[in-house]
């Protein structure tokens, strides 16, 4: 009797634990975090090499 009383839309669509907007926000946050983890060490190395490069400091 339960299958008859439910609408076909409820039967076809799966129940999500989170809403769609929450899933999209989690994916975007993951992309931002992974991008910053990938780029920040490289940026730190570039800044360090620019500051300690002997030609830029005037030392021969």
From Swiss-Prot:
Keywords: Membrane, Transmembrane, Transmembrane helix. The chain crosses the membrane at residues 20-40. The keyword Transmembrane helix applies. It comes from the Eukaryota. The gene is Smim3. This is Small integral membrane protein 3. The record marks 19-20 as: Cleavage. Pfam families: Smim3. GO terms for biological process: nervous system development. The keyword Transmembrane helix applies. It is a single-pass membrane protein. GO terms for molecular function: identical protein binding. It is found in: Membrane.
